[in-house]
Curated annotation (Swiss-Prot):
Gene name of the record: metN
Major localisation: membrane
Annotated protein name in UniProt: Methionine import ATP-binding protein MetN
Organism expressing this protein natively: Vibrio vulnificus (strain CMCP6)
Topology of the protein relative to the lipid bilayer: Peripheral membrane protein
Quaternary organization: The complex is composed of two ATP-binding proteins (MetN), two transmembrane proteins (MetI) and a solute-binding protein (MetQ).
Catalytic function, reaction form: L-methionine(out) + ATP + H2O = L-methionine(in) + ADP + phosphate + H(+); D-methionine(out) + ATP + H2O = D-methionine(in) + ADP + phosphate + H(+)
Functional summary from the UniProt entry: Part of the ABC transporter complex MetNIQ involved in methionine import. Responsible for energy coupling to the transport system.
Similarity section: Belongs to the ABC transporter superfamily. Methionine importer (TC 3.A.1.24) family.
EC top class, as a word: translocase
Pfam families hit by this protein: ABC_tran (PF00005), NIL (PF09383)
Keyword Amino-acid biosynthesis found: no
Domain ABC transporter: residue ranges: 2-241
């Protein structure tokens, strides 16, 4: 449905070249929800703007539903964009128009008659849960309701693709989840392909079938959500997965943490479990095998793409040789171990 082939994008500041995208290759299958995640400045917003040619790639091709957008005239591109809906972080609603009229705008511009507009807008407002808000104005809506209006407007032209540019980042957690559930429902009911960008791994975990991780304008890693969470190959992927779990080191431990091991101190470790390692009794195994005591300070477990993953912060109480052997045993069994320091 969407093919991004060897796409590069260069911006210029005077004589300075800024490479926002570097040789990006992605294939997004029809009917999937595909996430692109990256930190601020990673290039993800530039990428999604290239997909509907709001930004023209410096080189490479963008193919949507078999049509190479980079080869179209302005008139052809304008017509083709009707197959591509887009929603934004800040909604972009017209404050002087009612909810009904905001959703009707693309239909008016397409020359639809009043009867067609009435029928389509009523159907869409029902779909997004705003059937009772026809005559309301944006100023009287919550953030979540405004985004629902924006989604309805984006669907007015019956697009085959819906682009979501940080669509939930301005919303509170509960509202974010309700918007994600709505997007899942739209994907299921309308069979529409959804490409969304985000800086939050929780969004990817909640809604996406596949994900690409972007850093410094480059494609770092891609795969199904289950694959990425079960077998992250890069440190950036580990960082994003870690961000979905709430693990904090108690303040009294932080002040006692030493960078090197001294007499009377013990290692504080962060353990990352993915896939099969989550269910394996590895912690009890190292306790028995190496005769060490283990104090668990915090732990968290979650699911994504049908895969369990979890993290744990623990203190190991043994002699230095046994502690090191236990850490090596965990690593040999595909647990990522980070020694955070030594607690005195």
């Amino acid at each position: 449905m969407i093919e991004i082939n060897q796409v590069n994008k260069v911006f210029y500041q005077g004589s300075k070249e800024i490479h926002a995208l570097k040789d990006i290759n992605l294939h997004i299958a029809e009917g999937t929800i595909f996430g692109v995640i990256g930190s601020s400045g990673a290039g993800k917003s530039t990428l999604i703007r290239c997909v509907n040619m709001l930004e023209a790639p410096t080189s490479g091709s963008i193919v949507v539903d078999g049509v190479d957008l980079t080869k179209l005239s302005k008139k052809q591109l304008s017509e083709t964009r009707r197959n591509i809906g887009m929603i934004f972080q800040h909604f972009n609603l017209l404050s002087s128009r009612t909810v009904f009229d905001n959703v009707a705008l693309p239909l008016e511009l397409a020359g639809k008659d009043k009867e067609q507009i009435q029928s389509k807008v009523t159907e869409l407002l029902k779909l997004v849960g705003l059937a009772d808000k026809h005559e309301s104005y944006p100023a009287n809506l919550s953030g979540g309701q405004k985004q629902r209006v924006a989604i309805a407007r984006a669907l007015a032209s019956d697009p085959k693709v819906l682009l979501c540019d940080e669509a939930t980042s301005a919303l509170d957690p509960a509202t974010t989840q309700s918007i994600l559930e709505l997007l899942k429902e739209i994907n299921r009911k309308l069979k529409i392909t959804i490409l969304l960008i985000t800086h939050e791994m929780d969004v990817v975990k909640s809604i996406c079938h596949e994900v690409a991780i972007i850093g410094g304008g480059e494609l770092v890693e891609k795969g199904t959500v289950g694959e990425i969470f079960a077998h992250p190959k890069t440190e950036l992927a580990h960082d994003f997965i870690r961000s979905t779990l709430d693990l904090s080191i108690p303040e009294d431990y932080q002040v006692r943490l030493q960078p090197t091991r001294v007499a009377g101190s013990y290692p504080l470790v962060r353990l990352e479990f993915t896939g099969a390692t989550v269910d394996a009794p590895l912690v009890s195994q190292i306790s028995r095998k190496y005769n060490i005591d283990i104090s668990i300070l915090s732990s968290d477990l979650d699911y994504a793409g049908g895969v369990k993953f979890g993290m744990m912060v623990a203190e190991l109480f043994g002699n230095e040789e046994d502690d090191n052997a236990a850490i090596e045993y965990l690593r040999e069994h595909n647990v990522k171990v980070e020694v955070l320091g030594y607690v005195l």
